[in-house]
Amino acid sequence: MTDVPIKYRLIKKEKHTGARLGEIITPHGTFPTPMFMPVGTQATVKTMSPEELKAMGSGIILSNTYHLWLRPGDELVARAGGLHKFMNWDQPILTDSGGFQVYSLADSRNISEEGVTFKNHLNGSKMFLSPEKAISIQNNLGSDIMMSFDECPQFYQPYDYVKKSIERTSRWAERGLKAHRRPHDQGLFGIVQGAGFEDLRRQSAHDLVSMDFPGYSIGGLAVGETHDEMNAVLDFTTPLLPENKPRYLMGVGAPDSLIDGVIRGVDMFDCVLPTRIARNGTCMTNRGRLVVKNAQFAEDFTPLDPECDCYTCKNYTRAYLRHLLKADETFGIRLTSYHNLYFLINLMKNVRQAIMDDNLLEFRQDFMEKYGYGKNGRNF
């Protein structure tokens, strides 16, 4: 590929781990890495305004190709001037390929060499998504970073199935590259698959690196495997990817997974976790997970997280948040969502500083102890 709109600049490597401090330059601005990306499934991060996301330090957000294709339609978004104008967001946007949603949401999937036939989860109509169509949709959306169409096999699928799957994903990636109409202003990433099989991850990475994408994603994780299994896959996968290009771990947002991914050389992460759990009153704090809807907080007039300086924690008490959530007030969801997003974005800011100071392992140990990991199993 000759025109590369996405560039990675390495600033510093951490002395004791594979972590790296850098920045990614896109047509809509530059953001620091490692970075957690809030997910705006339907062209909005649930309950958050663009101004709030900018204020908390979100340098890039993610939107979902599958959902925007179905509603309101990628051609409508193109007529609006692209996703940035449509949602009034002037910073970088990443779109996924739609593949994961097809496999996780849609019914009656039929995978062939041409693509995937499935039922629309909204109205049951029959639809078809191919590598070329996934690229066309994302070209219409106009995201800065877009994803190749891939199959995301379950982590514990048999070896023979996963081998056929990654070989097809490589062929789909090549087809997507050929179909890409806007290589001058949209960077297309290849997605490494292979479940937990090292040789298949190696084969997948080799195939994709030979195609010279401007960046690479690691897919097929955070789909039911253990934390240790995820780390093991990252241990043998990230070294296969070029050092001069971004590395994106898809669908990961638990604090320990973010830190451990950074230690293994990952630059970008996304997950719906912070906003999804916030809607149920579950909040991440510096002292671990807290379910603010619980009765014990009915008369707790302290901040949600006394160690956090976000808008929610500076202005509202646990008792008030509990009241809002119990009364089904949208403002309560806004406040808990703001806090959880701020928490992860600020965590990554602190991780970047730890890389600069060459003390990421000490940072990890201190964070894990305070958060409560290991006391009652994993505690996201």
Curated annotation (Swiss-Prot):
EC identifiers of the protein: 2.4.2.29
UniProt cross-references to InterPro entries, sorted A to Z: ArchSynthase1/Queuine_TRR (IPR050076), TGT (IPR004803), TGT-like_sf (IPR036511), tRNA_ribo_trans-like (IPR002616)
Molecular function GO terms recorded: metal ion binding; tRNA-guanosine(34) queuine transglycosylase activity
Catalytic activity: 7-aminomethyl-7-carbaguanine + guanosine(34) in tRNA = 7-aminomethyl-7-carbaguanosine(34) in tRNA + guanine
Top class in the EC scheme: transferase
Superkingdom of the organism of origin: Bacteria
Residue segments, region RNA binding: 251-257, 275-279
The entry's keywords: Glycosyltransferase, Metal-binding, Queuosine biosynthesis, Transferase, tRNA processing, Zinc
Record note on cofactor: Binds 1 zinc ion per subunit.
Active-site residues, record numbering mapped to chain: 96 (proton acceptor), 270 (nucleophile)
Pathway linked to the protein: tRNA modification; tRNA-queuosine biosynthesis
Gene Ontology cellular-component annotations: cytosol
Database matches in Pfam families: TGT (PF01702)
BP GO annotations: queuosine biosynthetic process; tRNA wobble guanine modification; tRNA-guanine transglycosylation
Cofactors: Zn(2+)
Summary of subunit composition and partner proteins: Homodimer. Within each dimer, one monomer is responsible for RNA recognition and catalysis, while the other monomer binds to the replacement base PreQ1.
Summary of the function given for this chain in its UniProt record: Catalyzes the base-exchange of a guanine (G) residue with the queuine precursor 7-aminomethyl-7-deazaguanine (PreQ1) at position 34 (anticodon wobble position) in tRNAs with GU(N) anticodons (tRNA-Asp, -Asn, -His and -Tyr). Catalysis occurs through a double-displacement mechanism. The nucleophile active site attacks the C1' of nucleotide 34 to detach the guanine base from the RNA, forming a covalent enzyme-RNA intermediate. The proton acceptor active site deprotonates the incoming PreQ1, allowing a nucleophilic attack on the C1' of the ribose to form the product.
Family from the record: Belongs to the queuine tRNA-ribosyltransferase family.
Matching HAMAP family: Q_tRNA_Tgt
PANTHER family reported in the protein's UniProt record: QUEUINE TRNA-RIBOSYLTRANSFERASE
Protein name as it appears in the record: Queuine tRNA-ribosyltransferase
Protein species of origin: Streptococcus suis (strain 05ZYH33)
Gene name in the database record: tgt
